[in-house]
Amino acid sequence: VFQSYELFPHMNILDNITLAPRKVQKRSRKEAEAEARELLARVNLSDKEKSYPRMLSGGQKQRVAIVRALAMHPELMLFDEVTAALDPEMVREVLDVIMELSEQGLTMLIVTHELSFARAVADRIVFMDEGRVVESGKPEEFFTAPKTERARTFLDNFRFVARSRKEEKSA
């Protein structure tokens, strides 16, 4: 699931979700649509199945992209900065869906700068810089006692930005 949604603009939401299960997995339209409707209900988008992507908010499009991927019954889901292109108000609804998937035991690889979310949902953190793995470990270890200078610098900068924003709001 990518940050740019990759929905087909000329197809309604139901058709966007059911295309791959019908064409790739050779599932019947009836079966694919029934599952798509169940998945849309899980992400609170039942009323959008006949809508086109241009009619949806960024958060809604991202949830449709997640549903489309889930309709293929993946063993592993890759989320590549799925909240990067969203307004702050829309980020929460997408992260809630991913959190629910985590609680259901779906294996996920999540590329994100949403550090508090990563800390809450991850079994393992892999910190990368310029395409290289700098550090890897359990979330609590990474966030409380990073092993590398690069990870410490990154976290210190993140904490500084978070404190600055908090101070601006209280002023």
Annotate each language-model stretch with its function.
Residues 140-171:
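C-terminal boundary and immediately downstream tail of ABC-type ATPase nucleotide-binding domains
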Residues 2-130, 134-136:
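ABC family nucleotide-binding domain
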